[in-house]
């Protein structure tokens, strides 16, 4: 199950953090899905701006500390071979707002 919802509304990408039971705290699967949402946004020439928001009355509680504490998830590499950002797209250079 993805915890990130991507919707295109005209030139706007609406990216929703959808893990309200954890106040949208980011764990590895959500970080990967969030990164993919921004890769998708960046690649689509019809989309001009992205709006990131949270479901369930919360924006984001930050990193899910239970998941981040797992030593097996530290020092992972992303698919391009660089360091994996714990929050998904935090280290991605984006050309669009």
Predicted regions span which residues?
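Conserved CoA-thioester-binding segment of acyl-CoA-metabolizing enzymes
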Residues: 1-55, 69-71
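An acidic, glycine-rich surface segment that forms the CoA-thioester-binding/catalytic face
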Residues: 33-35, 39, 49, 65-97
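Short, active-site-adjacent cap segments at secondary-structure transitions
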Residues: 57-61, 66
């Amino acid at each position: 199950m993805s915890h990130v919802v991507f919707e295109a509304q005209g030139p706007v990408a609406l990216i929703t953090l959808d893990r309200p039971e954890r106040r949208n705290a980011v764990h590895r699967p959500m970080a990967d899905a969030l990164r993919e949402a921004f890769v998708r946004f960046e690649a689509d020439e019809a989309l001009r701006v992205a709006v990131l928001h949270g479901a369930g009355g919360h924006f984001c509680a930050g990193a899910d500390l239970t998941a981040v504490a797992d030593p097996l998830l530290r020092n992972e590499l992303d698919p391009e071979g660089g360091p994996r950002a714990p929050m998904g797209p935090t280290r991605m250079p984006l050309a669009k707002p």
